[in-house]
């Protein structure tokens, strides 16, 4: 995992997914949620899918009035272009919250969990994801 910090956009997978969202809009969100559903059925979410889920949660929280101010510059343009289409996805908040919970569940289910646990930075990463989940829940 190419990561330089524990933040939602502090790794290559997250930035790649954000670029996909910028290009594809809501279709990228639908795609990552479908990939999460497939992964959960198989019992394991790989780090690329998990990173996409984290970024989708950031985008959704921001679009519903609970942004992470530190990310405004990075997500603002893509969100401005695709916000309406993103919010039109059925059950988006419920599905994204469920996916985020799976990413943060355990090392048996989530590669991101496993990688962060091995890195020695798990507590900081998990705290950041829990804070994101709280913002998403409040949104």
Question: Positions of the model-derived regions?
Answer:
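Low-complexity intrinsically disordered segments
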Residues: 90-139
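Residue-level detector of well-ordered alpha-helical segments, enriched
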Residues: 28, 48-55, 92-95
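Residue-level signature of the C-terminal ends
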Residues: 24, 63-66, 103-106
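Short terminal alpha-helical segments
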Residues: 1-45
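Helix-loop junctions that connect tandem helical modules in alpha-solenoid scaffolds
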Residues: 42-44, 84-88
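Short, solvent-exposed secondary-structure capping/transition elements
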Residues: 62-75
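Short, hydrophobic/amphipathic alpha-helical patches that form generic packing surfaces
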Residues: 51-65
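Gly-Asp-aromatic-enriched flexible segments
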Residues: 36-40, 49-50, 137-139
């Amino acid at each position: 995992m190419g990561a330089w910090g524990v933040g939602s956009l502090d790794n290559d997978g997250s930035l790649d997914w954000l670029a996909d969202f910028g290009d594809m809009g809501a279709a990228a969100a639908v795609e990552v949620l479908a990939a999460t559903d497939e992964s959960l059925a198989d019992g394991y979410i790989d780090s690329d899918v998990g990173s996409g889920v984290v970024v989708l949660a950031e985008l959704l929280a921001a679009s519903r009035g609970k942004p992470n101010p530190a990310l405004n510059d990075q997500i603002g343009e893509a969100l401005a272009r695709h916000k309406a289409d993103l919010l039109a996805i059925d059950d988006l908040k419920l599905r994204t919250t469920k996916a985020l919970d799976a990413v943060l569940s355990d090392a048996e289910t989530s590669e991101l969990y496993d990688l962060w646990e091995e890195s020695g930075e798990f507590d900081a990463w998990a705290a950041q994801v829990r804070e994101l989940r709280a913002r998403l829940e409040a949104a």
